[in-house]
A protein has these predicted regions:
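An acidic/histidine-cluster motif and surrounding catalytic segment
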Residues: 1-153, 164-179
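Periplasmic solute-binding protein
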Residues: 161
Length: 179
């Protein structure tokens, strides 16, 4: 398959902390989660994220008709986005960029705007984009004593919750997000 071998070769050859150009997986069938690898050895595919997305949406009682872009990025890239988008000039583990603004969790401010996010071909709505810093994920997994896969899953679900309007600025918001 064109592009598939080069994707794995680019990711396998990458150093964990060395930025590499983004390479997208070829679209073979309609996916709900599109994964891009910018840096590091990448062995977690879209199926991993799709199962987590389905589970999170099920728990929240949200229909499973969303699509998300996930990019595994370098420390430099996530720091740059954090500074540009949030005004925080430091490295972080995960950033989320929702396609809609929310009044409160699961309630978009402009419900009509959602119709513009529908891909008529697939029937899926674009929920937004999640950036995960792979090297921070690896460091946190070691720090917390669990697998990189578990930490990656936690960061992804955390990002999905942000895409759906959840936040953790106040203690109550934090509790709601954790529940």
């Amino acid at each position: 398959l064109p592009g598939r071998a080069s994707f794995f070769a680019a990711c396998d050859a990458a150093e964990v902390f060395t930025p590499k150009p983004s390479v997208k997986l070829p679209v073979l069938e309609e996916k709900r989660v599109y994964v891009t690898c910018e840096t590091g050895v990448h062995n977690i595919g879209s199926d991993f994220f799709e199962e987590l997305l389905k589970g999170a949406l099920h728990v929240l009682g949200v229909p499973d008709n969303y699509r998300i872009d996930v990019e595994l990025v370098s420390r430099a890239t996530i720091k740059e986005y954090n500074a540009q988008k949030r005004g925080v000039d430091k490295v972080t583990d995960v950033l989320s960029f929702p396609a809609l603004d929310y009044a409160k969790p699961l309630q978009p401010k402009d419900k009509e705007a959602a119709r513009f996010l529908l891909d008529e071909f697939s029937g899926l709505y674009q929920l937004g984009e999640i950036l995960i810093c792979r090297s921070v994920c690896v460091a946190q997994a070691h720090e917390y004593g669990h697998s990189v896969e578990r930490e990656m899953g936690y960061l992804f679900v955390h990002g999905v919750l942000h895409l759906l309007g959840f936040d953790h600025v106040t203690d109550e918001e934090y509790r709601q997000m954790r529940d």
